[in-house]
A protein has these predicted regions:
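A short, polar/charged loop-to-alpha-helix boundary motif
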Residues: 376-392
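Flexible phosphate-sensing "switch/lid" loops adjacent to ATP/NTP-binding sites
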Residues: 1-174, 189-350, 356, 363-365, ...
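The conserved Walker
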Residues: 177-178
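Short clusters of small/polar residues that mark proteolytic maturation junctions
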Residues: 372-373
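Short HxH-centered metal-ligating active-site micro-motif
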Residues: 390-422
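Hydrophobic positions on the alpha1 helix immediately C-terminal to the Walker A/P-loop
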Residues: 185
Length: 497
């Protein structure tokens, strides 16, 4: 992987910039954290060199000044809203996040339940947190929010919310997911702090879109691809252009809400500290790109992967056609097609040659390895073994797992576990390989290559099973699939998608 982002520079510059912003106010800053505080794999893919936990590392540098406030909506508690990436409810994720932050030496001050209306489930969650010794505050639904500014910024609006007692200069406001009410919590606190004679500040920390690179830069287009389901649109910040004559990039929701925020700031402070949505941000990522070409190419590949992921969801009925059409449009804007992903043509060519499912993997040196379906192995399983043999320098003809090791697993699947498919999935073939490694030097050597698969690109000519998809993720392989089922699949239709 070619590095395009200076992570060390980012950690230093970002923490310094946040300290500067704290100093612009009465040593009190409410920082709304958008996106993921850790495990930010999108950023690490489009900015090669960005570490998935960079934002968390940056916060740890400020740990003596920072406290975290976690926000959750009572409506999300009531609906048992699930985090799609983790499969857990938002209220469970609050406890998970607290444990992670505290384990890293970060201080979690409290939890805020927004849109509170004495919902039974919200009250139960509040009681549960308080029994654990966690401070809980309630923020209520405000009639006319967010447009009725005179009412919102009054004792009958923000004034009815609980005042969150904080003890440190930097208050990081985060949440399990979008729509939790982070911004409203920050603004409510500005109102209450002002009542207490403190001129606290507000800032927003989101990595994307990057404000100081071009609108149609592939990194920013990749952000639109990542949020295609939300229909976020990057745009030139008109307020910043008018105030400073400078072109900067923001996204539509921040631009649309800025006049309302500006009016709120004016009502709280008497004047607004910001002239544009860009002014509110503190993101320094754009200043830390050290190889623009590397970041552009990484982002183009991300857009293609997002396109394939959308086509898969469309086949499963999990997204709209509009989402897929938007991704096609973004590919056009980036001047790319699926053929710019090297593993795609290689997989389709192999599938045509063998008249069956095929999979291809691009190794770190750029060479392509293929896998095809056989009586013993599925295409993805064969691909993994072939890639490991190639990395280990083992001749292709050498069998690193003997058929005698595979056949008992096949028998178990078909005779006792009710499976109709005797071929080994990727998880099963890796277990067989690990067993063989106890007695085979070649199998052991192949096993040792597994970490080298991290970040490799894969394409499969059909939709693989969920087990294989999950295994690719566990190995940190970036995989795409054609949105069609294998011909003998019960789900097969001749049209595909």
């Amino acid at each position: 992987m070619k590095i395009g982002f200076d992570n060390e520079k980012y950690l230093k510059m970002q923490s310094e910039h946040i300290r500067e912003r704290i100093g612009q106010f009465d040593n009190k800053l409410y920082l709304e954290f958008g996106g993921k505080l850790f495990d930010d794999y999108h950023a690490s893919r489009v900015l090669p060199g960005f570490q998935p936990d960079s934002k968390l590392c940056m916060l740890r540098e400020l740990s003596d000044q920072a406290e975290i406030v976690i926000v959750i909506s009572a409506e999300d508690i009531e609906k048992n809203k699930i985090r799609g990436d983790l499969g857990i409810t938002y209220d469970s994720d609050v406890l998970r996040l607290m444990q992670i932050y505290q384990g890293l030496g970060l201080y979690v001050g409290s939890v805020v339940i927004t849109k509170y209306n004495a919902q039974e489930s919200a009250e139960l969650f509040k009681n549960r947190l308080e029994k654990l010794g966690i401070k809980v505050y309630r923020h209520y639904l405000i009639p006319g929010y967010p447009t009725n500014v005179p009412f919102i910024v009054s004792d009958d609006g923000y004034g009815k919310n609980d005042y969150i007692k904080t003890s440190r200069p930097l208050v990081v406001v985060t949440a399990p997911g979008p729509g939790s009410g982070k911004m409203a919590v920050c603004l409510s606190q500005l109102y209450h702090e002002h009542k207490h004679g403190i001129k606290a500040g507000y800032a927003k920390f989101e990595t994307f879109p990057i404000w100081n690179i071009p609108l149609k830069h592939p990194v920013n287009l990749a952000y639109e691809a990542a949020t295609a389901d939300l229909n976020d649109i990057n745009m030139i910040d008109p307020f910043h252009l008018e105030a400073y004559g400078e072109t900067t990039i923001n996204y539509n929701r921040d631009v649309e809400i800025f006049p309302v925020l500006n009016a709120m700031f004016q009502r709280i402070y008497g004047e607004s500290p910001y002239k544009s949505p860009t002014d509110m941000g503190v993101n320094m990522a754009g200043n830390c790109i050290c190889d623009d070409d590397a970041c552009q190419e990484a982002s183009r590949q991300e857009i293609i992967r997002r396109y394939y992921a959308s086509r898969r969801r469309l086949l499963l009925g999990a997204c709209s056609e509009e989402e897929t059409y938007k991704l096609e449009m973004l590919m056009n804007q980036a001047n790319i097609t699926v053929h710019d992903r090297p593993v795609v043509d290689a997989a389709l060519t192999e599938a045509e040659r063998t008249n069956g499912p095929a999979a291809t993997l691009e190794l770190p040196d750029g060479s392509i390895v293929t896998g095809k379906t056989s009586d013993l192995l599925g295409a993805c399983s064969a691909l993994l073994l072939n890639a490991l043999k190639e990395l280990a320098g083992i001749e292709h003809e050498i069998k690193i797992i003997s058929p005698q090791a595979i056949e008992p697993i096949q028998s178990l699947k078909t005779k006792y576990l009710g499976s109709r498919n005797p071929r080994l999935h990727t998880d099963e073939v890796l277990i067989a390989l690990s067993v063989s490694a106890a007695t085979s030097k070649d199998a052991r050597l192949a096993m040792d290559q597994l970490p080298k698969l991290k970040g490799c690109q894969v394409h499969v000519s059909v939709m693989p099973g969920s087990v294989d998809i999950k295994q690719f993720k566990r190995l940190s392989i970036q995989a795409t699939f054609e949105a069609k089922y294998e011909k003998n699949s019960v789900f097969f239709n001749n049209k595909g998608v």
